[in-house]
């Protein structure tokens, strides 16, 4: 399960946490919910390098989240490639894509977040992207930009 919030950097995280940690009702829900999780909570902060956040997407929208960890010595090239891939996916799928790098969380991790209106639109975007010769060609030419085996794709559906 993922909880996401838009903040302005570390100061925004601090201000949000101060407010939440001071709310006894929130803290009792966190304590009760801890038994439902598979492990401790993990904080991440993504600094967008490409794409516009815009308004929060509506309930039922789908975020396809792809992550990878940049190989040592490949940061500049990986960021350029990541931005180009985000732009390519936007042009193929017709959906907004955010690309960013972790400010904290897994060191060197980059993330692409593609937002679709619903599950049908997410399926269509994925099919269009995977059927693109340009997209597949760029993936095939990725070289040593990322650590082998570090790629991961997940899906998040907005419920509220």
Show the residue positions of the predicted features.
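Short S/T/G/P-rich N-terminal loop/turn motif that feeds into the first structured element of a domain
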Residues: 1-160
